[in-house]
Design a protein with these regions (language model features):
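A structural boundary/capping signal
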Residues: 1-304
């Protein structure tokens, strides 16, 4: 049993436990109550209890404390950092709006307006799509919010795409996950890198992925960047008005993982690799601003 009821009740029937002996329970499939967890707006402390009964009498009981995070809260790199991939939400309705704006920006720049992922087999085309997404986010007029101290280690609540588009405020991790979702929905493979006190987005320029979901060395990223297989993007630049060009966002993000900063690099999470390990996006829809509230996008992309 659990209090609050974040677990669905589960019972096992054991025919016999001999004196001074033990029995291993093989069926340990305890089901979480997703509906309850989805209602948590803030983290709460709870407990899970295992009770042993015989003939209706309790003969043993053990209770363990559990911390329940809010539905939109990531626990940090200290525990299962790969779960950050769940906050890349490509199917959030807000992402389609961003990709629509990115398509218009491509068209205005005289480029093909299809958001076609790796279909063209061109690294230059991936750069163009990523640059157009950057421009579309710049046009939102987002304001910067200071993240919690040591968020990359201890975690934080993450604003979902619809919340960002509605309220126009975000931390570096919020905008990074927004970019990740847009890149993923565009058919590209995103990466999230976590230097100390910061978060930046990345995208593979060809259909690649890291060998594991999470890496803790920046050298792997640097090698792929040098091979022109991967770029990183400083997503907080979208909160500057006017925003720096896309090439500057790429250069600045790359500087955040220089060898001199290796001792402060926390992790990088490969979103596509996480999906192949069944870490899927959060199942939560958000409202996007209605069309009458939207302002026309102004192409500010840097598209060679």
């Amino acid at each position: 049993s659990a209090n609050p009821p974040f677990l669905k009740p589960k019972s096992w029937r054991l025919d016999r436990i001999g004196p001074d002996s033990s029995v291993s329970v093989k069926d340990r499939d305890v089901e979480l109550d997703g509906g309850f967890l989805l209602t948590l707006a803030d983290s709460v402390r709870g407990n899970a209890t295992v009770t042993v009964e015989h003939d209706g009498h309790v003969v043993a009981e053990e209770t363990k404390p559990v911390e329940l995070l809010a539905y939109n809260e990531w626990g940090g790199t200290g525990f299962m950092p790969e779960l950050l991939a769940a906050f890349s939400m490509p199917n959030d309705p807000a992402i389609d709006r961003l990709l629509h704006d990115a398509s218009l920006i491509l068209r205005a720049a005289g480029k093909p307006d299809g958001i076609d992922g790796y279909h063209s087999k061109s690294r230059q085309r991936v750069w163009e799509i990523a640059s157009a997404i950057y421009a579309a986010v710049c046009n939102l007029g987002i304001s910067y919010a200071v993240p919690p101290t040591s968020f990359e280690r201890d975690g934080q609540k993450i604003r979902l795409p619809g919340q960002i588009l509605e309220n126009r405020v975000s931390t570096c991790l919020d905008t990074t996950m927004l970019f990740s979702a847009a890149l993923e929905q565009a058919g590209l493979n995103p990466v999230v890198a976590l230097p100390r006190g910061h978060a930046v987005a990345g995208v593979w320029l060809q259909p690649e992925e890291l060998s594991t979901i999470v890496i803790d060395d920046a050298e792997t990223l640097r090698k792929r960047i040098q091979l022109e297989e991967l770029i990183l993007i400083e997503t907080t630049f979208v909160t500057s008005h006017p925003a720096p060009p896309f090439s500057k966002a790429v250069a600045t993000a790359t500087e955040s993982i220089t060898p001199e900063r290796d001792d402060t690099f926390h992790a990088a999470v490969d979103i596509r690799r996480a999906r192949s390990h069944r870490i899927f996006p959060l199942c939560r829809k958000s409202e996007t601003p209605s069309a009458k509230d939207e302002t026309p996008s102004i192409p500010v992309a840097e598209l060679p």
